[in-house]
Design a protein with these regions (language model features):
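Nucleotidyltransferase catalytic core that binds NTPs
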Residues: 1-149
Length: 149
């Protein structure tokens, strides 16, 4: 059985995420979605639009997804990567969406950089541009909604 992992904030889920899930599922037999927890979102964006348990419930309802896990980032995390979860889950494939590419993985300041190094150590295949070009932005959706209130 080929396990595929994707990760992200998914706050909120949008069309680009759906394309990511559909294409990632086609890469293997079992798709695990790792949603960044509320601590990670607060550190990255400064707000949480949908709490992690709500995002998890929504993700679990999407037909291409076999399993949903939430990251274990502590409050005010210094490590924004998902290396701990990658080492625990040990997927066969780590699929990255349209806004994450090899250039990003090669950039030392990117959280994808240590993830790429760990994938090499654990013999996890990294795949980029899954789901096509970046189609939408959760942050932009939230911003537009806020402007229309």
């Amino acid at each position: 059985m080929t396990k595929v992992l994707v990760s992200g904030g998914f706050d909120p889920v949008h069309i680009g995420h759906i394309r990511l899930f559909k294409e990632a599922k086609a890469l293997g037999d079992y798709l695990i979605v790792l949603a960044n927890n509320d601590n990670w979102l607060m550190a990255k964006k400064g707000f949480v639009f949908m709490k992690e348990d709500e995002r998890k419930t929504i993700l679990e309802a999407i037909r291409w997804i076999d399993e949903v896990q939430i990251t274990k980032h502590s409050k005010n995390p210094t490590d924004m990567s998902i290396c701990a979860e990658l080492a625990e889950i040990k997927p066969d494939i780590f699929a990255n969406g349209g806004d994450r590419d090899k250039k990003d993985a090669d950039t030392n300041s990117s959280s994808l950089n240590p993830e790429q190094k760990l994938c090499q150590q654990l013999n996890i295949k990294m795949v980029f541009n899954v789901g096509g070009e970046k189609a939408q932005s959760s942050s932009e959706l939230v911003k537009r909604a806020k402007q229309n209130i």
